[in-house]
């Protein structure tokens, strides 16, 4: 209500707000101090010591920024012209296939049961989703193949009856194919193949996935270099006051770089399980965002990887497509005697079967775009993946992002350690 006193912010929120304010103020303070240090004349003694935590903070911020960029960029190998083995490619693009397989093993298999998902498709809806013209064209092409094209095109009752029969029996055949695929979908559809191909074939997809799901956490790694590095730099300064051989600053600078990166990575993923200590909640920063990340991950996977075009392409041309077309052939063999009925046309079945299979293989890819919207609506994968991911135990959920840091953790720490040592040595030798 108007005029009501506002509730005090919780301690965790106040601490977070203070750290953000300090992080925003530090660069301007560092610039001012740097200007004083570089001004003509000998800088005052206190400034030499004050620069130690400022340099530590800024350097760790810069090295963490560099390390995060090195995770994802460049997306293709970039080497020296004459020394092609000397260069760099982002950790994620370089190991895209391995990481895509890890995502399948650690995440996708926990979210999606292929058999249950395909049961959501209604065979009659799929059969009706293909337009009448598709069935009519298919019937005429098959009739041409076996020498009965005149019947399909007859401008009489015969032609109308032929085409009507084709549409009725064609829909029955398509519905039976869908039911047969549902019965053994594990053999006809390879979930690993569609995910790995969708992610690893274009490294931009994998980079975008990790950047989107880990945006806040990657930003934390960068910004934590500033305030963690600055805080540890104060300890570094205190040590320098009582123990100041030139190499001590280099040694402590390297230690600050090492500890800063370790603390930042651990803060993202540890502790895995939520812990309450007084008014504070101790929980990995990434794990706190499980609901938010689940929504981002599900939306991304459904729109970019597990969408209807990719699903139909996997069925028709993927690694298990041989079994899919065997199912189609089996259903044609069952359907033809029923469609032709007893009589003169029954002996045509043996001739018609391979012709019909060949034409379906040719024409079905042209017809499935009419099924994309229906397929996405009936499978409805986004809420399924979102809800399943939200329900994952924390230890399983952290596998969504942790593999990126596991691959690059040593690189990030080595860069921070080496540059911290170099900066400390430069400070000591320059007298600033």
Placement of each model-derived feature along the sequence:
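Large intracellular
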Residues: 8-17, 38-214, 255-400
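Transmembrane alpha-helical segments and their cytosolic interface motifs
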Residues: 44, 48, 52-56, 204-250, ...
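Alpha-helical transmembrane segments and their juxtamembrane interface "caps"
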Residues: 24, 89-93, 225-228
């Amino acid at each position: 209500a108007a005029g009501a006193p506002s509730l005090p912010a919780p301690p965790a929120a106040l601490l977070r707000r203070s750290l953000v304010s300090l992080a925003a103020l530090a660069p301007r303070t560092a610039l001012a101090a740097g200007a004083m240090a570089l001004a003509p004349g000998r800088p005052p003694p206190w400034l030499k010591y004050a620069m130690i935590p400022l340099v530590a903070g800024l350097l760790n911020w810069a090295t963490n920024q560099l390390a995060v960029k090195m995770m994802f960029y460049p997306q293709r190998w970039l080497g020296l012209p004459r020394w092609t083995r000397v260069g760099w490619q982002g950790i994620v693009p370089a190991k895209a296939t391995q990481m895509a397989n890890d995502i399948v093993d650690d995440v996708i298999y926990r979210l999606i049961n292929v058999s249950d998902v395909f049961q959501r498709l209604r065979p009659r809806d799929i059969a009706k989703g293909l337009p009448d013209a598709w069935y009519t064209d298919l019937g005429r092409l098959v009739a041409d193949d076996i020498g009965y094209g005149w019947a399909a095109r007859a401008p009489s009752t015969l032609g109308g009856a032929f085409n009507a029969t084709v549409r009725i029996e064609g829909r029955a055949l398509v519905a039976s194919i869908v039911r047969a695929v549902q019965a053994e979908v594990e053999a006809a559809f390879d979930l690993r193949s569609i995910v790995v191909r969708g992610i690893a074939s274009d490294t931009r997809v994998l980079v975008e996935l990790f950047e989107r799901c880990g945006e806040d956490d990657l930003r934390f790694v960068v910004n934590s270099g500033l305030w963690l590095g600055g805080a540890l730099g104060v300890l570094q300064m205190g040590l320098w006051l009582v123990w100041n051989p030139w190499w001590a600053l280099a040694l402590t600078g390297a230690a600050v770089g090492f500890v800063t990166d370790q603390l930042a990575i651990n803060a993202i993923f540890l502790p895995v399980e939520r812990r309450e200590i007084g008014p504070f909640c101790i929980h990995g920063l990434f794990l706190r965002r499980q609901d938010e990340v689940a929504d981002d991950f599900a939306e991304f996977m459904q729109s970019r990887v597990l969408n209807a075009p990719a699903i139909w392409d996997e069925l028709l041309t993927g690694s298990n497509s041989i079994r899919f077309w065997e199912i189609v052939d089996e259903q044609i063999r069952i359907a033809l005697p029923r469609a032709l009925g007893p009589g003169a046309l029954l002996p045509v079945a043996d001739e018609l079967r391979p012709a019909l299979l060949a034409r379906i293989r040719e024409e079905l890819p042209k017809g499935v775009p009419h099924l994309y919207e229906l397929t996405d609506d009936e499978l409805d994968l986004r809420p399924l993946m979102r809800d399943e991911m939200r329900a994952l135990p924390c230890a399983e959920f952290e596998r969504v992002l942790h593999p990126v840091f596991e691959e690059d953790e040593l690189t990030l720490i080595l860069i921070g350690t080496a540059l911290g040592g170099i900066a400390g040595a430069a400070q000591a030798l320059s007298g600033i």
